[in-house]
């Protein structure tokens, strides 16, 4: 059976259409503003060359914004980076899906493709504007979100330290409850997505922990029991010894959400549900608030230097986890390609075989869910493993709040009822899933 058609702005009035029409130009306007405001910094760092680069980048971004708004054809990349050829091959592939004489364009091509392409074009605009090529146009928003989420970060770091101090006294059932709590914290931390708010303040200002019970009815797929079963089945029955267990987390947003991922990763080690945690981040600024290597290291460094004892204790511990290699950082170009994940084995076989070593791969956030399911018009009741088509490297769990109109694995009638009661239920971030597939 062929999978359904891709979500696309050609469906007028759809969320994809509104994203391309309104949100992407709005994000580019913010990028233009950020680059312009940093003109003096570019001058201080690079003299006149920096000012010229700023002008060149601004011109590039203004032209890009116009291309989107007027539904121009998608252009090949020209920046000779290590992924340029892959992007241009993907453009050729998109052409093969169209009728003769048609060309891929912003409002006619798959939404997943053109939205990813916009962020890669932003990167191209900087690469072609040396010496400001390394500048992260989204960094200001990410650091601001981190600082504005301080009360929630303090509450979470404090909770983690109390859990670790008490871990020896916990029964198996209590450990299961703690895992469930921290999975929920990871889920609702995923609300802090700057690409959805167009880069406006979207920080976490209160402690999520106190709200978990009231949020429970909004979890549409709750596979937390099964996640516990996957992680806790780690004893060798003959010897009673614990087996090595690897968990991978494919990261989403920097800021508060990244802290929730770190807290979960630390707790997995303390609860002896994992012996090593591998983090996968983006190798370039992406979707406004996605985590890069700089964000990853910056966050740990800022926690270490915090004047709150449990925040700084977390920072110190997490740095040690990296030094001891029980936390391992990865980045791969594939995460910033437009390909859906069922193409990973073919396009990035090295990454696919890396994920195959995992006992559980956790995919954070909406973009990962869209790529897992191919960002298609699936029926709500289609089983998750079926929507993954050929992508089954290891048991995998998606943790996302809904901010795009794709959702599978619901019980019959649930999607329809929500659609009639709350037309924006799939895009508001109010609902979430912790959705597991154990197909391998």
Swiss-Prot record:
Cofactor requirement: Mn(2+); Ni(2+)
InterPro entries from the UniProt entry: ARMT-1-like_metal-bd_sf, ARMT1, ARMT1-like_metal-bd
EC id: 3.1.3.-, 2.1.1.-
Motif (Subfamily III RTxK motif): 400-403
Residues involved in substrate binding: 252-253, 366-370, 403
Pfam families named in the record: ARMT1-like_dom
Presence of keyword DNA-binding: no
Catalyzed chemical reaction(s): beta-D-fructose 1-phosphate + H2O = D-fructose + phosphate; beta-D-fructose 6-phosphate = dihydroxyacetone + D-glyceraldehyde 3-phosphate; L-glutamyl-[protein] + S-adenosyl-L-methionine = [protein]-L-glutamate 5-O-methyl ester + S-adenosyl-L-homocysteine
Biological processes per GO annotation: DNA damage response; methylation
Top-level taxon of origin: Eukaryota
Residues reported in the UniProt entry to bind Mn(2+): 252-253, 290
GO MF annotation terms: fructose 6-phosphate aldolase activity; fructose-1-phosphatase activity; metal ion binding; protein carboxyl O-methyltransferase activity; protein-glutamate O-methyltransferase activity; S-adenosylmethionine-dependent methyltransferase activity
Free-text function comment from the UniProt entry: Metal-dependent phosphatase that shows phosphatase activity against several substrates, including fructose-1-phosphate and fructose-6-phosphate. Its preference for fructose-1-phosphate, a strong glycating agent that causes DNA damage rather than a canonical yeast metabolite, suggests a damage-control function in hexose phosphate metabolism. Has also been shown to have O-methyltransferase activity that methylates glutamate residues of target proteins to form gamma-glutamyl methyl ester residues. Possibly methylates PCNA, suggesting it is involved in the DNA damage response.
Protein name stated in the entry: Damage-control phosphatase ARMT1
Gene: armt1
